[in-house]
């Protein structure tokens, strides 16, 4: 900004020339025109003692000079003159202005406001029933600078529906259209500014802060808004207090010291200070004097650029200062404009021409800015000069400039102006102008602004940081905010080159949630999330359970998908059972092969011949049924498992039952009866018994499948990390009834052979059958408690094992001994050993008798 730098030097040179010389700056604060705009600017301030000692409603002297207020007033002058010199907005018309000093005091501001509301051509306000045709001295008012003053003037001007456009008042309450129907502003409301502040705190993880506000409407409302926004974002306010305005009384001093003590006790490193410049001046004065440890101060816009605060001695001791200022367009010619008018103020000829015009308002109001006419270099802070030279005050200057253009645009719309002229029928009244300002858009340099329904404009913010390059700070832009915060970390200066930490408790590790201690949510212990839950967000207070189809280990930040679990073919237990299947199936096939090879031998014939082979085939099918249990279950496999296992077993046990019945008959009945019954047990009737038993078992299986069909179930509760898919048995009682046929056959076999006495010199067939049935019962009786206690995932493996062990037991106890005789004891493979002498004789007699009868018949 070279032009602004030149302006700063020119201003300094002018002020040096102005030492001891009388200037005429105050006389430049009024200009005539077709329409007059009022202006309220903080050109000075008063001593607090003067207000305390005031006992009569007389004038209040403004003893201090405010350079910033002077620059803002000159920005309004420049905007008015720019509009008058152009033809884009008000061709053929001139705007005038009447600027007054608010002295930063409500009492002084009220007096100026009353002068604006006085009837044109007079200095008084008359009482009327209807003010519709009332013509005040000014058409609209620019200002004031502070929300405290705007709350007062806003109600004054709203009664007359006079448009008021503030360039700095940002209280959110001023957006209330019922109370302030004629109030507008060219800055965003404090709510937007505080949203930016909360975003800044979140960005640096500053969740343990103090919040202080000035003891006035501005500070109290700001604290209220900040508190609600901070709570919604998980930021804890360790201490919240109000700072009294600057006062030398002992009572006020005690309040300030109490605020400082409580901030120290809260052990915060960041303080949000939403206060007026006077309150901040009071707080920082005592903070520096009493040696408060440096903090990070997040400033409100009202004091971030205040020369009252920036020129405080030893201000650098307070620490780091950050704050947001609304962004505006640059006005590069403003430096030249200020330089020119300051030079004119020192020109005696120019001042003499102004003195020739009598200012009637000065008889009532007094001189507009007494301190402006005798300012000297020491009246202007070096920090303000540096910031102005660097273009750091352009946001406030532009806001004033834009406020003037908003009124000019509204007047342009009201008068229906075009590029050549305006339709001037009669003088425009303030309420007529106001009608055209609602939701109006207007141009100010490169920006297009628009008033919303609440009279606010939407503008971006610049994040400013105080940088100590001299006894007073200089503002540096270190970020922007337009709904999202963008920081320039390389431009930020921190003590020790480390970002301060302001947290009550450390950040929890991954997979941990917060358990609050006390009243503040930011003070907490970290608790691990248990298995099956996870931490969804870093600020969570409870662990979030995983979905049904997910799982998580302890201290998780996310859930993992559950893998399906079933008895897979590749599992070791399945592979072991498949090896056992091969063994049992191999033995059954070997026994079947030997039986077929020795089909005519007494051993095979005594064992039932075809029934013996049929039993071996059924035993093999019984073993093969285990192949239905491994793998991912399906509806078909679940339905087929029990029938495919029990029907072959019924066929096998029915043949063994016939063997047991024949053994019992031969041993316990007379020979004639025994021979007669044995002929039936070895003929067609024997197959009818097998068919009947199989039919009964098939009927039971059909009833089981129809009444209680097993189904594929997805079980989420059995395994912590997997989802179990298995065949669900809907009724264990019905499944037990499916076993009833086989159990009855086995019991009858055991009963028929256990009591039979063996005959000397004969093969003890009853012993093999007894042990075979014992193997059956031991297997399935052991199966019940084992199945009840094993995990559901491995219940199919238990059923597979029971089937194979049962088949192996029958093979080992009944079939393999016969194979042993066929292979290694062929001398015992005789009719006498397997059938006995009586049986052989009876067989021969039956054979001879049959032949004689046949010959007789022939």
Swiss-Prot record:
Positions glycosylated per UniProt: 58, 85, 130, 203, 264, 379, 387, 418, 439, 482
The record's tissue-specificity note reads:
Expressed in circumvallate, foliate and fungiform taste papillae as well as in taste buds on the palate. Also expressed in testis. Not expressed in brain, heart, kidney, liver or spleen. The topographic distribution in various taste papillae is different from those of other T1R members.
Q: Which UniProt keywords apply?
A: Cell membrane, G-protein coupled receptor, Glycoprotein, Membrane, Receptor, Sensory transduction, Signal, Taste, Transducer, Transmembrane, Transmembrane helix
PTM: The addition of even a short carbohydrate group at Asn-58 is predicted to disrupt one of the contact surfaces required for stability of a dimer.
What's the superkingdom here?
Eukaryota
An annotated Gene Ontology molecular function: sweet taste receptor activity
One annotated GO biological process? G protein-coupled receptor signaling pathway
Q: How does the record say this protein sits in the membrane?
A: Multi-pass membrane protein
* Impact noted for substituting residue 261 to C: In strain: FVB/N, ST/bJ, SWR/J
Gene3D superfamilies in UniProt: 3.40.50.2300, GPCR, family 3, nine cysteines domain
Kindly report every residue range on the membrane side named Cytoplasmic.
594-610, 666-687, 757-767, 818-858
Task: Report the transmembrane regions from the record.
Answer: 573-593, 611-631, 645-665, 688-708, 736-756, 768-788, 797-817
- Entry-linked PANTHER family: CALCIUM-SENSING RECEPTOR-RELATED (PTHR24061), TASTE RECEPTOR TYPE 1 MEMBER 3 (PTHR24061:SF435)
Q: Which family does it belong to?
A: Belongs to the G-protein coupled receptor 3 family. TAS1R subfamily.
Subunit-structure text: Forms homodimers or heterodimers with TAS1R1 and TAS1R2.
Function of the molecule: Putative taste receptor. TAS1R1/TAS1R3 responds to the umami taste stimulus (the taste of monosodium glutamate) and also to most of the 20 standard L-amino acids, but not to their D-enantiomers or other compounds. TAS1R2/TAS1R3 recognizes diverse natural and synthetic sweeteners. TAS1R3 is essential for the recognition and response to the disaccharide trehalose. Sequence differences within and between species can significantly influence the selectivity and specificity of taste responses.
Indicate what this protein is called per its UniProt record.
Answer: Taste receptor type 1 member 3
């Amino acid at each position: 900004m070279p032009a602004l730098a030149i302006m700063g030097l020119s201003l300094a040179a002018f002020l040096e020339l102005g030492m001891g010389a009388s200037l005429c700056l105050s006389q430049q604060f009024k200009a005539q025109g077709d329409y007059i705009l009022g202006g309220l600017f903080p050109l000075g301030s008063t001593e607090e003692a003067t207000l305390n000692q005031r006992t009569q409603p007389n004038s209040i002297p403004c003893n201090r000079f405010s350079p910033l207020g002077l620059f803002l007033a000159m920005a309004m002058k420049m905007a008015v003159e720019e509009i008058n010199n152009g033809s884009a907005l008000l061709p053929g018309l001139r705007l005038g202005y009447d600027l007054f000093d608010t002295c930063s005091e409500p009492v002084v501001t009220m007096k100026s406001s009353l002068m604006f509301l006085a009837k044109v051509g007079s200095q008084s306000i008359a009482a009327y029933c209807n003010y519709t045709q009332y013509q005040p001295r000014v058409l609209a008012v620019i200002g004031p600078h502070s929300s405290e003053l705007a709350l007062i003037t806003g109600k004054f001007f709203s009664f007359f529906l006079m448009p008021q456009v503030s360039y700095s008042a940002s209280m959110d309450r001023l957006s209330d259209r019922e109370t302030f129907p004629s109030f507008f502003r060219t800055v965003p409301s404090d709510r937007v500014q505080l949203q930016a502040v909360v975003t800044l705190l979140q960005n640096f993880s500053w969740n343990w802060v103090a919040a202080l506000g000035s003891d006035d409407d501005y500070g109290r409302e700001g604290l209220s808004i900040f508190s609600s926004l901070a709570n919604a974002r998980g930021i804890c306010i360790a201490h919240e207090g109000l700072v009294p305005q600057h006062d030398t009384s002992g009572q006020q001093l005690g309040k300030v010291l109490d605020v400082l003590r409580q901030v120290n006790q809260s052990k915060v490193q960041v303080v949000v200070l939403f206060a007026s410049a006077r309150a901040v001046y009071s707080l920082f004065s005592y903070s520096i004097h009493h040696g408060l440890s440096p903090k990070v101060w997040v400033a409100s816009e009202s004091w971030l650029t205040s020369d009252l605060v920036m020129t405080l001695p030893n201000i650098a001791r307070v620490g780091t200062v950050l704050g947001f200022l609304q962004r505006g367009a640059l006005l590069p010619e403003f430096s030249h404009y200020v330089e020119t008018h300051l030079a004119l103020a020192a020109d005696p000829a120019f001042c003499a021409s102004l003195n020739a015009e009598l200012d009637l308002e000065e008889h009532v109001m007094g001189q507009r800015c007494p301190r402006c006419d005798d300012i000297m270099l020491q009246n202007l802070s070096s920090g303000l000069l540096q910031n102005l030279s660097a273009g750091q005050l352009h946001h406030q200057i532009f806001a004033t400039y834009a406020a003037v253009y908003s009124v000019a645009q509204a007047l342009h719309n009201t008068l229906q102006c075009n590029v050549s002229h305006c339709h001037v029928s009669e003088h425009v009244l303030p309420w007529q102008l106001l009608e055209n300002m609602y939701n109006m858009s207007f141009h100010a340099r490169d920006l297009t602004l628009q008033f919303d329904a609440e009279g606010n404009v939407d503008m971006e913010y610049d994040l400013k940081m105080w940088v100590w390059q001299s006894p007073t700070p200089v503002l540096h832009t270190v970020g922007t905010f337009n709904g999202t915060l963008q920081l320039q970390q390389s431009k930020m200066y921190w003590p020790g080159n480390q970002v301060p930490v302001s947290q009550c408790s450390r950040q929890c590790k991954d997979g941990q949630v917060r358990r609050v201690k006390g009243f503040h949510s930011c003070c907490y212990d970290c608790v691990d999330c248990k298995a099956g839950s996870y931490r969804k967000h870093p600020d969570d207070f409870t662990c979030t359970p995983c979905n049904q189809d997910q799982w998580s280990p302890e201290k998780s930040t996310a859930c993992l998908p559950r893998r399906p679990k079933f008895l897979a073919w590749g599992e070791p237990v399945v592979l072991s059972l498949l090896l056992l299947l091969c063994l049992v199936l191999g033995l059954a096939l070997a026994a079947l092969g030997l039986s077929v090879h020795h089909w005519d031998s007494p051993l095979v014939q005594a064992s039932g011949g075809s029934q013996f082979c049929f039993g071996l085939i059924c035993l093999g099918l019984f073993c093969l049924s285990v192949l239905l249990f491994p793998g991912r279950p399906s509806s078909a496999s679940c339905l087929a498992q029990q029938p495919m296992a029990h029907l072959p077993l019924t066929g096998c046990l029915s043949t063994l039952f016939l063997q047991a019945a024949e053994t019992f008959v031969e041993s316990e009945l007379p020979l004639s009866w025994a021979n007669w019954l044995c002929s039936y047990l070895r003929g067609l009737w024997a197959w009818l018994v097998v068919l009947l038993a199989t039919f009964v078992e098939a009927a039971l299986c059909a009833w089981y499948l129809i009444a209680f069909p097993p189904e594929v179930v997805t079980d989420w509760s059995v395994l912590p990390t997997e989802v179990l898919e298995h065949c669900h048995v809907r009724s264990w009682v019905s499944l037990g009834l499916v076993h009833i046929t086989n159990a009855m056959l086995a019991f009858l076999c055991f009963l028929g052979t256990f009591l039979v006495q063996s005959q000397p010199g004969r093969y003890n067939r009853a012993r093999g059958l007894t042990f075979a049935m014992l193997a059956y019962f031991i297997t399935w009786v052991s199966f019940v408690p084992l199945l009840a206690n094993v995990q559901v995932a491995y219940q199919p493996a238990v059923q597979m094992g029971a089937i194979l062990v049962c088949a192996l037991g029958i093979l080992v106890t009944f079939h393999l001994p016969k194979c042993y005789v066929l292979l290694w004891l062929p001398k015992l493979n005789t009719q006498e050993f397997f059938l006995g002498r009586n049986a052989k004789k009876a067989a021969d007699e039956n054979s001879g008798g049959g032949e004689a009868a046949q010959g007789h018949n022939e």
